[in-house]
Amino acid sequence: MKILLIIISFFFIGNSNAEATVKLPKDVSSGSKFEKSLTGKYYKKYGYQIVNKADGHPVRSGEQSIRFEVRDGDCGQDEDGGWSDCKGDRERHELSGASSAMSKGEYWFSWSLYFPEEHQNLWPLSNNYGQFHQRKSQPVFMFIELRGGYSVIRTIGDVDYDERRLIRNDDMKGKWHDILINAKWSKKDDGFFKVWVNDKLKYDYKGPTKTAKYVYQKIGVYSTGITRYMNYENIDNIEKCFEEKGRTTDENTALYTLYGKKIKHDISVQIYNKCKSFYKSVKIPTRVVYFDEVRKNKKKEKVGVFE
């Protein structure tokens, strides 16, 4: 799992050109500057929108919130072509706080999440709703919807890995969830990362919180493992493919684990490329999430929900 998370994260995040920069109203965000993550032509107008309570959208506090949406096929590349989601087995619409990156010290963060009633857990497609990334390196904390629900995953260094469920599947939809984080960015053992959900402490880690110089926040929808989803939805057709084309020992093992919705990234791509001509057409359901009260500050009282 650790290797998979490193593979699915990319190293060239953040583009500071004027076209990429977005200005979020104080009603929904404070403390960080955000820009579109990947600024190629793929970034759709519906990718992120500032929406209003008056128009029937859910809002945690105030009059506005941020709505993110990813539809089937919403992959693209950055302006210089250095990174491509389409080639990398992923889709996204995210905002990046790379221009407000932090090098050290203690910070407080907050955001509130709302998953609509029609929301679906699409595992083994991995949907990331928020993360802390490093410049030119891997993420350190990711907030991913795993099979059992919304979870925090720690990936610091080559061997460190941990995951903790924050919100159960049966408690996610149709309500706001308030996330509060207290973090100290450090390469040493004096670092820490604490997560409260709806005023309850759910995660309390002490130790190094980074390996690179700078850490920054990202919000939105980031889907990884498109081929895993396609393979799972065509699992019977993989059997037909293997009967005709044969199978390696690794492919046979991967198929067995896929029945349990588990499969490693590289072998998933390999099986997809080998067997896709046997597949039925599959459209990934649209992913929608609302963010509100996205705040960063050195002081706890400056983040969270302000009624």
What are these regions (language model features)?
Residues 3-14:
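Sec-dependent N-terminal signal peptides
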